[in-house]
Amino acid sequence: MEATSATVAVSLGVLLIGAPIAATGGETPKNGGILNYVIPADAPPSFDAHRETTFATIHSAAPFYSVLIRVDPNNPSSTTDFVCDLCTAIPQPAYGGTTYTFKIRSGVKFHDGSPLTAADVAASWEHIVHPPEGVLSPRELHYVMVDTIDAPDPTTVVFHLKFATSAFLPALADPYSWIYKKATLDHDPRWYEKNILGSGPFKFVEYQVGQWIKGAKNPDYYDKGLPHLAGFTGIYADKQAVRVDAIRADRAAIEFRGFPPSVRDELVSALGDKIAVQTSDWNCGSFIEPNHKKKPFDDARVRRALTLAIDRWHGTAALAKIANVRTVGSVIFPGDPLAPSNEQLHEVAGFWSDIEKSRTEAKRLLKEAGAENLTFELLNRDVDQPYKYVGIWITDEWSKIGVKVTQKILPSGPWVAAERAGDFAVVLQANCHSVVNPLIDVQPYLSSSISKQNYGNYEDPKQQEIFDKALHETDPAQQKQLMFQFAKHVMDIEAHKLVLPWWYRIVPYRSYVKGWKISSSHYLNQDLANIWLDK
């Protein structure tokens, strides 16, 4: 159906994302009601999740679609717990971990009434893993391990891998991997950019650009008893003040991306027990990226000096009071089984426990590199949280070793354009992902010829060698050792990128919203099926 037309009954539903909350304590879900939520964007660039990377597409249209597997909506904070959506069971891999055979639910229908079969699942994944010419698939690199995808019968999909890897199953749970209709993809692979047709818990009702998107309960949804909501309205509002006012006035119940600490405090103070709060470490991390093609940032000594100047252990605690950052960590999501311990981090330049020793070494390196009076411009994004706050903090840290930095702050579009064109000396970036999958999440740190997300303009065969070993390693202990070796190489030995504190998700929302639990990403758990309203 056209994404601008209304062809099914209206209904509203929303999904929140915040910090871990207790289970509903035996409460019986109530059916019905419309959930209004705010989306912190003016509009999604398109409705095709296969080609987009923004939460605006997920928050707008995820309720209309199904996926093959997903994070467990009852345990979304886990980095290892995956459950079926369209499949009937998570399979055990065969042939040395290189073959995964999924059985697909029977009786699933697209919203136009046509049956969904294994052929649709295979075609959708083929579209993502091996996109046809002219079709954008930004996560194609996530599936380098996939060889072929077959649908030998209407209820079976088989993934054949080139090699066994623990990165495959988490990659398969990617929330952008919506299942489309094979016949539609065959006819026009770009049809889904402007149209919506899925098999999810809600049916599309109406879309008004810059205003709202509406969905209604799918009465034929295959997961019987769900969804609880009669429908949802997602309200677009790119200004934070507008979103906060909407929640305060109960025109909206929640905003799934998250707010800074000050907004949490404001809403709790004003509304008391009418507001609940969930928080979580966020699978988003800030980092500084020097342009290796710009002198003196082609010199590892200069890059290393810049990371040594930063007092992450003390500075992060202060920054967390005003910005949505909190956790000191490496290139790997904190708390993941592959993440290094704090003791290991203390071995890495920029994470030493003695900041004075660290800054003395930074000054020595700058002098040795002939860059004692270093001045440069930091390219930053015109977004308060956390970009501007982190930018102010980091420039102050550098001043403590005599480095003078000014900020060039650009709107998101020109900021991205400058990155892609290499028109910067040093840039403040963010590395955000959905499902925690360290072997995939570190891809922006790979050489520029390999990763389109690396704007540092460097090639590093040694780094690639370590990564390839980790990707192919199936022993968890050996893999963890290799990933620490990779992290130390990126963050210390070459200091290709300066890893800053990981973000922290804070989601204050109306306490009548029930059935939702936080995850580590604002991309996850957004189909709204489990949410219900206690009013």
Model-based region annotation:
Residues 1-31, 127, 148, 338-339, ...:
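Short, low-complexity disordered leader/linker segments with a strong preference
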Residues 30, 103, 137-184, 206-208:
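Surface-exposed binding/hinge segments that line
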Residues 36, 117-124, 154-160, 200-201, ...:
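Alpha-helical secondary-structure segments
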Residues 38-95, 126, 195-198:
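N-terminal lobe/hinge region of extracytoplasmic solute-binding protein
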Residues 54-63, 208, 212, 217, ...:
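Detector for C-terminal structural segments
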Residues 55, 89-134, 152, 158, ...:
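Aromatic- and charge-enriched surface segment that lines or borders ligand/interaction sites
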Residues 69-77, 173-227, 231, 241, ...:
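Gly/Pro-rich hinge or "lid" segments in bacterial periplasmic/extracellular proteins
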